């Protein structure tokens, strides 16, 4: 009869050829860790995608509003660069597309889809960065445009010898226009900064998912 030594519920068998230790299956804990990381990744992606799409819709809506307003003297040149760049439209569509593709990839994680999501998010980072620069330049140009508007109103009033009440009304018109544009562009700038952060985070998550997918293959 072969003697057995029992220690901590682990059976060690002593045979004439030596001591045989039982081999532990290390693949199961590794698989559990990968499954846990995958579940955590899916939860993070759902939250990021929801915020990303809402921000993109807001940028698109603000772009449509700015494009549909009637010509505003002295202020048109300020935000026309933003509209001509196409950022409120093309950038927003890229953000929405990357969000939708992230949802599809989260449900069916394959290497081509993961690579496509990573590429779209990298492009979204580029668009957000360019958008932040353009919006910042537009915001900086609002004050000079407002001053030109006020000076033009003053000259017009002097030439036509208008009364003081009309003068105050025209000056307030310039101030109100500046305030509205400042608010709209500031909201777009904040959302663009948020989109930049979300796109960077999404790119990092999909990069990690790509590594995990390669390990499983």
Swiss-Prot record:
Principal subcellular localization: membrane
Transmembrane parts of this sequence: 47-67, 85-105, 122-142, 187-207
Bilayer topology annotation: Multi-pass membrane protein
Region: Disordered, residue numbers: 1-33
CC terms in the record's Gene Ontology section: membrane
Polar residues: bias regions: 1-20
Record topology, Cytoplasmic segments: 1-46, 106-121, 208-217
Location of this chain's protein in the cell: Membrane
Tissue specificity remark: Expressed only by thymus, spleen, peripheral lymph node and bone marrow.
Keyword line: Membrane, Receptor, Transmembrane, Transmembrane helix
Extracellular topology ranges: 68-84, 143-186
Matches recorded under PANTHER family: MEMBRANE-SPANNING 4-DOMAINS SUBFAMILY A MEMBER 6B-RELATED, MEMBRANE-SPANNING 4-DOMAINS SUBFAMILY A MS4A -RELATED
Function: May be involved in signal transduction as a component of a multimeric receptor complex.
Entry's family note: Belongs to the MS4A family.
Name the record gives this protein: Membrane-spanning 4-domains subfamily A member 6C
Organism name: Mus musculus (Mouse)
Gene: Ms4a6c
């Amino acid at each position: 009869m072969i003697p057995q030594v029992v220690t901590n519920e682990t059976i060690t068998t002593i045979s004439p050829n030596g001591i045989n230790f039982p081999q532990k299956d290390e693949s199961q804990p590794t698989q559990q860790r990968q499954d846990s990381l995958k579940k955590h990744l899916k939860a993070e992606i759902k939250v990021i995608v929801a915020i990303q799409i809402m921000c993109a819709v807001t940028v698109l809506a603000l772009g449509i509003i700015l494009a549909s307003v009637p010509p505003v003297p002295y202020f048109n040149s300020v935000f026309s660069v933003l509209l001509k760049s196409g950022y409120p439209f093309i950038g927003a569509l890229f953000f929405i597309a990357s969000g939708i593709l992230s949802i599809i990839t989260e449900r069916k994680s394959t290497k081509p889809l993961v690579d496509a999501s990573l590429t779209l998010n990298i492009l979204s980072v580029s668009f957000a960065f360019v958008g932040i620069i353009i919006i910042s330049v537009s915001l900086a140009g609002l004050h000079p445009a407002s001053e030109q508007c006020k000076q033009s109103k003053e000259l017009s009033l002097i030439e036509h010898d208008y009364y003081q009440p009309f003068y105050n009304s025209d000056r307030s018109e310039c101030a109100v226009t500046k305030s509205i544009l400042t608010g709209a562009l500031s909201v777009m700038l904040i959302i663009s900064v948020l989109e930049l952060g979300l796109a960077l985070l999404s790119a990092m998550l999909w990069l990690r998912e790509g590594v995990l997918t390669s390990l499983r293959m």
